[in-house]
Amino acid sequence: MLLRFTKMHGLGNDFMVLDLVSQHAHIQPKHAKMWGDRHTGIGFDQLLIVEAPSNPDVDFRYRIFNSDGSEVEQCGNGARCFARFVLDKRLTAKRQIRVETKGGIIELDVRNDGQIGVNMGAPRLVPADIPFQAPEQALSYQVDVDGTPVDLAAVSMGNPHAVLRVSDINTAPVHELGPKIEHHPRFPARVNVGFLQVIDRHRAQLRVWERGAGETQACGTGACAAAVAAISQGWMDSPLLIDLPGGRLSIEWAGPGQPVLMTGPAVRVYEGQVRL
């Protein structure tokens, strides 16, 4: 059986997108792992699956698999690609699209300038909701990593994030600390790890070690989580411009209980077919 797919990226964070509205297949974690291999497969950070909604209040269901086969709750860069995909494939004519994810409902807005806005919903900061093991909620936590205390913020954007402030983004220990914090026992569902350098009150640089994918060119939910951490701790003010290795995202957040708004591009790379 051959399945049509589209290769897309959001700031270099790359995706294989499958339409399972007009095609029918049962996708398993082993398929994501096989196709995600950059040497023997298609190669991607995440596999995005477009499905018909199970909820009448939304337009589509959105599922996400990392290249290691793990299914995750949310992907911000993927959400922008999702919006571009369903419009390009004429699965909808709407430019404001409501999508059901494992992490909750998000709202997508395809703008006339080609940029795509995503209402990511309100961040969750209660430790049990992230999930993160801590006796009480705080702006910052200290985590022991190989006997060394590491200060970080913990935020859920529908998926778990740890945010560390660094003085130099170029020398940040992304590949050393990233996997250790990702698998830290205080994050029982594992965690995405962001390394944030604040430039001024409205600009920052970010690198992200993604759970199940390693360092990626960009991470939309990571940028949202970093913005929440930076604004909460008084380092920065909304709106923010966050530069990632793959490009820039605009993030707005009005404070606790309010949704995080992310704006950025989505690009189609090529169309293909893969055998299931």
Curated annotation (Swiss-Prot):
Positions bearing the site annotation: Could be important to modulate the pK values of the two catalytic cysteine residues: H161, E210
Domain of life: Bacteria
Active site (record annotation): C75 (proton donor), C219 (proton acceptor)
Gene Ontology cellular component annotations, sorted alphabetically: cytosol
Keyword Cytoplasm: yes
Annotated S-S bridges: none
The reaction(s) this protein catalyses: (2S,6S)-2,6-diaminopimelate = meso-2,6-diaminopimelate
GO molecular function: diaminopimelate epimerase activity
Residues binding substrate: N13, Q46, N66, G76, N77, N159, N192, E210, R211, G220, T221
Sites annotated Important for dimerization: Y270
GO process terms (BP): lysine biosynthetic process via diaminopimelate
Coarse class of the protein's main subcellular location: cytoplasm
Cellular compartments annotated: Cytoplasm
Pathway(s) per entry: Amino-acid biosynthesis; L-lysine biosynthesis via DAP pathway; DL-2,6-diaminopimelate from LL-2,6-diaminopimelate: step 1/1
Catalytic activity, EC: 5.1.1.7
Key words of the record: Amino-acid biosynthesis, Cytoplasm, Isomerase, Lysine biosynthesis
Entry-linked InterPro entries: DAP_epimerase_AS (IPR018510), DAP_epimerase_DapF (IPR001653)
Top-rank EC class of the record's enzyme: isomerase
NCBIfam families named in the record: DapF
Free-text function comment from the UniProt entry: Catalyzes the stereoinversion of LL-2,6-diaminopimelate (L,L-DAP) to meso-diaminopimelate (meso-DAP), a precursor of L-lysine and an essential component of the bacterial peptidoglycan.
Assembly with partners or alone: Homodimer.
Family of the protein in this entry: Belongs to the diaminopimelate epimerase family.
Name of the protein described by the UniProt record: Diaminopimelate epimerase
Native species: Pseudomonas fluorescens (strain Pf0-1)
Source organism phylogeny: Bacteria, Pseudomonadati, Pseudomonadota, Gammaproteobacteria, Pseudomonadales
